[in-house]
A protein has these predicted regions:
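Conserved catalytic core of two-component sensor histidine kinases
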Residues: 56, 112, 142, 172, ...
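Extended, polar beta-sheet/loop recognition surfaces of beta-rich domains
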Residues: 2-11, 73, 78-107, 117, ...
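Solvent-exposed, acidic/flexible segments
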Residues: 44, 48, 52, 70, ...
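Sequence/structural segment immediately N-terminal to covalent heme-attachment motifs in c-type
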Residues: 43-68, 79, 93, 97, ...
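Periplasmic c-type cytochrome electron-transfer domains
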Residues: 1-42, 84-90, 105-122, 195-210
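Axial heme c-ligation environment in periplasmic c-type cytochrome domains
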Residues: 72-78, 96-115, 122-133, 159-163, ...
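Flexible loop/turn segments at secondary-structure boundaries
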Residues: 155-156, 172
Length: 215
C-alpha cells in the first residue's frame, strides 16, 4: 500500500513539473503586460479565461463562483467598491500578501445606549430612515470612528476602512448587523497567495478580477 501511494505521489509531482515547464513561459509573458491592459484588451481574452480558471480554483470558495461575494466578510469583486483600492497594482498586492482587517469593539467605550445612537447615525450616512434624535447623539460619538472612516464616513483605502455612505455592507447592512459590528468588532482575513500561485499567476488572476468591475 505504501509503495502504491509513493508511486502515485511521484507521478503527481512529475505531472506538476511537466505542467509548470509547459505553462510557466506563458504566464511569464502575460506578466510583462500591465494588469489594466491584460484585463481590457480583447486580444488578451485567453489570459482572462486562464485567470478565471485560477480564480475558480483558489478564490471562489469565499468570493463565490460569480465573484459577487457573500455576507460574513467576503466582498463583492464585481462592483467598484474597493476597501483597499481597485487599481491593478493594488489588487496584485492584495493577492500577494493578503490583508488583515480589524474593526474594534465599541461596547465598553459607548455602552449599549451609545451603540444604538451610533448605529442610527451610521445608517443615516447612506440615506436610511433613522431616529433623528438618536442619530444626532450618535454623530457626536462618531468622532471616535472618524479616525478610520473619516469625518464624512467615506472611509480610507490606505487602512481598508470601508465607505459608510454608499450602502455597501461587508457584513450586512441591517440594523442588527451594524449593531453587532459596533458591539463586538470584526476581524477580516484575506489569505496571501504569493507562495501558492507565484507572482506571474497572481498577475493573471488580478487581471481577471480587475476586468470584472471594468467592463
Amino acid at each position: 500500500q505504501a509503495s502504491i501511494e509513493s508511486g502515485a505521489l511521484i507521478q503527481y509531482d512529475r505531472e506538476i513539473k511537466f505542467a509548470n515547464e509547459k505553462f510557466d513561459p506563458i504566464f511569464a509573458a502575460y506578466a510583462k503586460i500591465d494588469v489594466e491592459t491584460l484585463a481590457t484588451d480583447p486580444q488578451h481574452a485567453e489570459a482572462l479565461k486562464v485567470g478565471q480558471r485560477l480564480f475558480l480554483q483558489n478564490c471562489a470558495q469565499c468570493h463565490g463562483s460569480d465573484a459577487r461575494g457573500q455576507n460574513g466578510g467576503f466582498p463583492n469583486l464585481t462592483d467598484d467598491d474597493w476597501l483597499y483600492g481597485g487599481s491593478g497594482a493594488t489588487i496584485v498586492k492584495t493577492l500577494q500578501g493578503g490583508r488583515n482587517a480589524m474593526m474594534p469593539a465599541w461596547l465598553d467605550a459607548f455602552g449599549e445606549d451609545g451603540i444604538a445612537e451610533v448605529v442610527e447615525y451610521t445608517l443615516s450616512l447612506s440615506g436610511r430612515q433613522v431616529d433623528q434624535e438618536l442619530a444626532a447623539k450618535g454623530k457626536t460619538r462618531f468622532m471616535a470612528c472618524a479616525a478610520c472612516h473619516g469625518m464624512d464616513g467615506k472611509g480610507n483605502q490606505m487602512m481598508g476602512a470601508p465607505n459608510l455612505t454608499d450602502n455597501v455592507w461587508l457584513y450586512g447592512g441591517s440594523k442588527r448587523s451594524v449593531t453587532e459590528t459596533l458591539t463586538y468588532g470584526r476581524n477580516g482575513v484575506m489569505p496571501a497567495f504569493s507562495k501558492t500561485l507565484g507572482d506571474d499567476k497572481i498577475h493573471v488572476v488580478a487581471s481577471y478580477i480587475y476586468s470584472l468591475s471594468n467592463k
